[in-house]
């Protein structure tokens, strides 16, 4: 099978990104060993951010994982409401790798957050196929929200973030990374918060 984002073989090496980023922060003296870090991840299929969750479960000190979506914000709506609803218009955006309405890796998170309740997960996935919508029990959503936040960026906001990042930092970022930076910039920041914006593609 191909190494697309539903393949667990792709998620496994992505886990190392989080440990490597954390190790670099420690080596540079930005954080102390054991200090928690928040990661913001541009994603449509929930693969890369799920790798971050795996890293946390393996012991990496992760404060929050922020799911950044484009205008196809099915994940943002899900994390806010507990309702996954793919019955919506599909938008073609300038961050096409995130143009997804059925986020296949979310099933893996539901399995873990529900205490490995295979009957529940199977029921929810069947609803997604037959009805296009499902509602996750509040107890499971509470577990998910202990780690995950979410936000989204429109194409105009994405373009503006690319422009402002270049003007202010002289760093050229691709549209997918810009989605994450836009979302991260709008999350309230506490004193001593350390945050990492994942860049998942290159503009070059």
What are the language-model segments listed below?
Residues 1-204:
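PLP-dependent amino-acid enzyme catalytic core
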């Amino acid at each position: 099978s191909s190494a697309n984002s539903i393949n667990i073989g792709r998620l496994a090496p992505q886990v190392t990104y989080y440990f490597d980023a954390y190790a670099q922060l420690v080596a540079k003296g930005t954080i102390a060993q054991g200090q928690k870090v928040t990661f913001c991840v541009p994603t449509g299929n929930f693969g890369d951010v799920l790798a971050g969750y795996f890293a946390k479960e393996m012991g990496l000190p992760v404060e929050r994982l922020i799911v950044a979506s484009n205008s196809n914000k099915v994940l943002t709506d899900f994390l806010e409401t507990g309702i996954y609803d793919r019955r919506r218009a599909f938008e073609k955006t300038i961050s096409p790798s995130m143009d997804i309405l059925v986020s296949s890796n979310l099933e893996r998170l539901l399995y873990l957050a529900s205490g490995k309740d295979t009957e529940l997960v199977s029921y929810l996935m069947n609803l997604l196929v037959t009805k296009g919508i499902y509602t996750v029990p509040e107890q499971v959503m509470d577990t998910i929200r202990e780690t995950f936040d979410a936000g989204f960026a429109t194409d105009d906001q994405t373009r503006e973030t690319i422009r402002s990042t270049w003007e202010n930092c002289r760093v050229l970022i691709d549209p997918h990374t810009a989605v994450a930076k836009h979302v991260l910039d709008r999350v309230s920041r506490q004193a001593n918060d350390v945050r990492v914006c994942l860049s998942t593609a290159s503009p070059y």
